Amino acid sequence: MLMISHIHWYERLWPLGSNGTIVQSNVVNNHTYRAGTGSSLVHLINGQAGNIESHSFTGANEPVLNITAVLDQEHFGFSKLTVVNATAAKWEFIRGVDGQVGDELWMIK
């Protein structure tokens, strides 16, 4: 698997196990994952704060990997984590241009 260490995009991956495969049992739906099970990790990558280098893009012949749930290579923005209680947290990607939620993920235990 190719890993890029410095990107300017927002990406949310499906819950991944130690072998790099998606742990389907931890996917409740597109916007809710089970966390804290010990079988997978939640990966949230936000390089969208913005800078003079602009965004990073996948190559024309480089498909988005099946481990990627959401990929935004267009908007700048920031992330907001809200811990609701001991068993639920909400992650939001907020677009800088209009303050709208570009992505949302609930993590439940």
Task: List each language-model region with its residue ranges.
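Long, structured stretches of catalytic cores involved in phosphate-ester chemistry, encompassing
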Residues: 1-92
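Short, solvent-exposed aromatic-acidic interface loops
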Residues: 92-101
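Membrane-interface soluble catalytic domains
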Residues: 100-108
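Short, charged/polar low-complexity linear motifs in solvent-exposed/disordered segments
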Residues: 28-29, 107-109
